[in-house]
Amino acid sequence: MSSYLSIYIVPKRKSEGEEKKHILVAAFSRNSEIYQYFNENIHPAYNGNKEHPYTTITKDRIQDVITDLSRDISSSKDRLMEYEKYAKDNPDYIQEIIELKQYISDLQYTQGEVCFIEDMIDSTDFYEEIEEVCCNID
């Protein structure tokens, strides 16, 4: 079964009684690192949950994702330095180094995408037309 992390913006409602409209702006598959980091840190609602089908992405929640990514990038860079140190005496580490460099690059790309989502959340303070940014898992 495939599932997706969906990111939505919610335009401001004209009245309190008006139903929220969720506009899909991005979706990430289960094998995406964004999906994994959001699932671990934000715990998005599942679309089948009738009472709470969406989770609001707050500044604190997105910061938790960024902090977790930064921690993983930092520890991976530390591990890379260790591998590079041992590679001089043992060429078996070369493949590990190549894979770890790719992993770090992927994490940095993911961090950039999450920072873009953070910018959307920050923009809700400036754009009166946007009520919130939220997510769920379909």
Write out the residue ranges for each language-model feature.
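Acidic (Asp/Glu-rich) sequence patches and key acidic residues
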Residues: M1-D138
